[in-house]
Design a protein with these regions (language model features):
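Conserved catalytic core of nucleotide-sugar-dependent glycosyltransferases
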Residues: 119-188
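Acidic ATP/Mg2+-coordinating residue in the GHKL
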Residues: 45-47
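C-terminal catalytic/acceptor-binding lobe
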Residues: 179-278
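Hydrophobic targeting segments
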Residues: 1-6, 30-31, 39-43
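Short, acidic, metal-binding catalytic loop of nucleotide-sugar glycosyltransferases
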Residues: 21-38
């Protein structure tokens, strides 16, 4: 059995809870579009999201009462002091989700953000290779809601945390709490871009998934984007030579255009991509 583990942000940490719910529902829809049904989706949250469609019992909400940071009364975004607690909240939820995956004796586990979309082919591919130590998504997609195209995203595992799959023998050590804590640290705390090397040091070979398996969505609620706003939003922009700036802009534009792919019906079907979400 394949288990997806998703940490869901509290409504108290969002400026737009209905949007968080809509984005998560699209993520869950992509999970439930798998071509094989041997999977579970464990979602750790403070409060279950409000959904417009019904899912069967393979979707499980694990409600936890982890401490929450406060919000500044003068700004819609979180106060600076909240960021460490917000990060800890996500880690705590991932650890709780991994523990639930162990209790369910999952053969493979994958951490999946609450707004990313997974290919309908992923579970079938992973379960057809029970001998594998695990997998990582080296190539994926990037999508910004409101657009009619996606962008190819190579080096996906360095951008999104929805990228690593681990076999049970490397995260489920019944009765050995310290080994399980070590596995959690390598999968969560080490950083998603460093997980391949971190597990290689333990003798674990994570293979690259041989197709673009996940869509990283940019939607204004990504933790990485919010953190960037917090760190760099008020930083003054240095002016550079106008010709050099223009050349750089042209180069970036050409590179971006070369990566674009139309959101075909096949891609929309594979990832349950809903272009109607603003």
């Amino acid at each position: 059995m394949f288990c997806f583990v998703t940490p869901l942000r509290s409504p108290k940490l969002s400026d737009n809870w209905p949007r968080i719910c809509a984005l998560f529902e699209r993520t869950a829809t992509s999970v439930f579009r798998q071509t094989v049904g041997d999977f579970r989706h464990v979602v750790v949250c403070h409060e279950p999201p409000v959904l417009t469609r019904a899912f069967d019992r393979r979707l499980e909400f694990v409600v936890k009462d982890f401490p929450l940071p406060g919000k500044s009364s003068s700004a819609p975004r979180l106060a600076p002091a909240a960021w460490p607690i917000m990060s800890d909240d996500k880690v705590n939820k991932l650890v709780a989700g991994l523990q639930r995956a162990r209790e369910q004796n999952a053969d493979f586990v994958m951490l999946l953000d609450a707004d990313d979309l997974v290919s309908c082919r992923l579970v079938a591919h992973v379960l057809s290779h029970p001998e594998a130590d695990g997998w990582f998504v080296k190539r994926g997609w990037r999508y910004r809601y409101g657009r009619r195209w996606l962008e190819t995203l190579d080096g996906f595992n360095h951008v999104s945390s929805s990228c690593n799959v681990l076999a049970r023998r490397w995260f489920n050590f019944a009765g050995d709490v310290e080994r399980e804590k070590s596995a959690d640290a390598a999968l969560i705390l080490q950083g998603h871009g460093q997980a391949v090397d971190a597990f290689a040091a333990r003798g674990v070979l994570l293979r690259p998934v041989p197709f673009r398996a996940v869509v990283y969505t940019e939607n204004g609620e990504n933790m990485s984007i919010l953190m960037h706003e917090h760190l760099h939003g008020d930083r003054p922009q240095h002016r550079s030579n106008s010709l050099r700036r223009l050349a750089g802009h042209c180069k970036r534009t050409m590179s971006a255009w070369s990566k674009r792919r139309v959101c075909t019906s096949a891609l929309r079907g594979e990832f349950a991509l809903d272009l109607s979400i603003p």
